[in-house]
């Protein structure tokens, strides 16, 4: 297969959802359909000796944080799919946001009993930065769910994206019978108890088929009425609008019952884009360019001090990686030979023989690689669009031993370069303030300061609720702003001026009072 064909068959996507919407279960079932797992291990089935392939393995746990979970590659039909995991609950961090900059499409999973939830809203905001195409899976149809029409309306209102239903549920909870596939004009019947295996559901072709009435009884007439209503009230699928991030195809199903996941995957490989062109400071890089290039979007540190390896995750943007090839680390101006990059075939770390645009490879990193770094076959490029996000949680960090302030500063700056947290130094005092988007980030920092930098630190509350990067076109206006609000200003790890607001009201007032100053939620790496 030539370079062009290899790239065209790739689909790189991430799953976004609120915790407990069923993301891990759907990841399992996606891998099951991709032939990567013979029998899906549901997350809760720990006692049955199966546990989730994409959750942390015991062996991985013993030596720190799992890296296998982060990327899973598997074949599906004629495509090769790269699924990037975005962590759930506590380990939610900026990594989650940045992972979304490394994909070409996203699958949004919604708990149909609850509808659109807060984490989903935040993640969707991030996909908007690049108008990423979104496919929606309404999950948990084997439970009592909200009215499906209401769910579509909520997605449209809250997330500002048009919905085009592709499948439609027949019944719900204990009375869930299956779905009607609008594009194929067929009913696919649901069988219970098949959650761990692939099921060939019985299909009935055509809404007017009398067989439907025999199998579904009165539900058949209800379905016909609903579909008629739906066709008048909802959007038809439009591929161009989907690619522009304006419309989402919606599938209904139950990941736990392994039903509907294959319909969604069929849609994903048929409609989601293959690797897309990427913006750099010099030019657009096309995926099919002959020469290799890529950027680092995430660094995974190993929590175990005995294994000081950190893995830098690199999204290949163009060309082909081959084992042992020489590539340029552009920021350092250094050529390096990469002999031991990792690929991630569905949960197993393996030496990468080769990788193509759209694939993710892992580079061993001993502290020289930073988030946002570009690697190329010699060309001086920098990929743009790898942002820092304004943190939402803040703590002041204090040393137990005041004599170690040099080590503390060094440690914090290195950890912030790696994207573990953000560090702010107020202009008016010598405090060090740490900012994060997830609580776990704080624990990781204290742990790593102690094990890697021999610094014992504790946190204290600090009166900061949100942060914005600030700049102004007119230097005089910026100077005046700095004079007037100096008690709210800090420098971040890269010496960028930041406004730390004690409350959201304070921030709004500052934005109104200083119209010539730009307050930004994101900053480029």
Curated annotation (Swiss-Prot):
The keyword GTP-binding applies. It comes from the Bacteria. InterPro entries: EF-G-like_DII (IPR053905), EFG_III/V (IPR035647), G_TR_CS (IPR031157), P-loop_NTPase (IPR027417), PrfC (IPR004548), RF3_C (IPR032090), RF3_dom_3_sf (IPR038467), RF3_GTP-bd (IPR041732). GTP binds at residues 17-24, 85-89, 139-142. This is Peptide chain release factor 3. Gene3D superfamilies: P-loop containing nucleotide triphosphate hydrolases (3.40.50.300), Peptide chain release factor 3, domain III (3.30.70.3280). GO terms for cellular component: cytosol. The keyword Hydrolase does not apply. It is found in: Cytoplasm. Belongs to the TRAFAC class translation factor GTPase superfamily. Classic translation factor GTPase family. PrfC subfamily. Increases the formation of ribosomal termination complexes and stimulates activities of RF-1 and RF-2. It binds guanine nucleotides and has strong preference for UGA stop codons. It may interact directly with the ribosome. The stimulation of RF-1 and RF-2 is significantly reduced by GTP and GDP, but not by GMP. Keywords: Cytoplasm, GTP-binding, Nucleotide-binding, Protein biosynthesis.
């Amino acid at each position: 297969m030539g370079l062009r064909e290899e790239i065209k068959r790739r689909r790189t996507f991430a799953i976004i959802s609120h915790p407990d919407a069923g993301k891990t279960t759907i990841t399992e079932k996606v891998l099951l359909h991709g032939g990567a797992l013979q029998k899906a291990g549901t997350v809760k089935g720990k006692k049955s000796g199966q546990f989730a392939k994409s959750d942390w393995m015991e062996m991985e746990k013993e030596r720190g944080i799992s890296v296998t979970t982060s990327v899973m590659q598997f074949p599906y039909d004629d495509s090769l799919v790269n699924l990037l995991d975005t962590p759930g609950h506590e380990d939610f961090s900026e990594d989650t946001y940045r992972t979304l900059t490394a994909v070409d499409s996203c699958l949004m999973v919604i708990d149909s009993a609850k509808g659109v939830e807060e984490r989903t809203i935040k993640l969707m905001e991030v996909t908007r930065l690049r108008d990423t195409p979104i496919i929606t899976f309404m999950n948990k149809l084997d439970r009592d769910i909200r009215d499906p029409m209401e769910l579509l309306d909520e997605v449209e209102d809250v997330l500002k994206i048009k919905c085009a239903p592709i499948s439609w549920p027949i019944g719900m909870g204990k009375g869930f019978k299956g779905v009607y596939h609008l594009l194929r004009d067929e009913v696919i019947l649901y069988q219970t108890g098949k959650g761990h295996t692939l099921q060939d559901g019985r299909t009935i072709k055509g809404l007017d088929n009398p067989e439907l009435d025999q199998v579904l009884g009165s539900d058949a007439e209800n379905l016909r009425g609903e579909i008629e209503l739906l066709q008048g009230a909802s959007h038809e699928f439009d591929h161009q609008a989907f690619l522009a991030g304006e419309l989402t195809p919606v599938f209904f199903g139950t990941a736990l019952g392994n039903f509907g996941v294959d319909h969604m995957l069929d849609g994903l490989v048929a409609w989601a884009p293959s690797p897309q062109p990427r913006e750099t400071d010099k030019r657009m890089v096309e995926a099919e360019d002959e020469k290799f290039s890529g950027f680092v979007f995430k660094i995974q540190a190993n929590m175990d001090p005995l294994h000081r390896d950190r893995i830098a995750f690199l999204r290949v943007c163009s060309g082909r990686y081959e084992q042992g090839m020489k590539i340029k680390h552009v920021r350092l101006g250094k050529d390096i030979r990469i002999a031991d990059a990792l690929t991630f075939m569905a949960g197993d770390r393996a030496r990468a023989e080769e990788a193509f645009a759209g694939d993710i490879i892992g580079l061993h990193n001993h502290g020289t690689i930073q988030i946002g770094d570009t690697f190329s076959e010699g060309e001086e490029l920098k990929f743009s669009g790898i942002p820092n996000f304004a943190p939402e949680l803040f703590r002041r960090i204090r040393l137990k031993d005041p004599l170690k302030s040099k080590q503390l500063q060094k440690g914090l700056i290195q950890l912030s370069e790696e994207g573990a947290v953000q560090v702010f130094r107020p202009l008016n005092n010598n405090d060090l303030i740490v900012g994060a988007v997830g609580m776990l980030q704080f624990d990781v920092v204290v742990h790593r300061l102690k094990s890697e930098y021999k610094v014992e630190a504790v946190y204290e509350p600090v009166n900061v609720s949100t942060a914005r990067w600030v700049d102004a076109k007119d230097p005089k206006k910026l100077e005046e702003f700095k004079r007037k609000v100096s008690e709210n200003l800090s420098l971040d790890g890269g010496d960028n001026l930041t406004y730390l607001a004690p409350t959201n009201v304070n921030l709004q007032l500052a934005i109104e009072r200083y119209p010539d100053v730009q307050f930004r939620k994101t900053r480029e790496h």
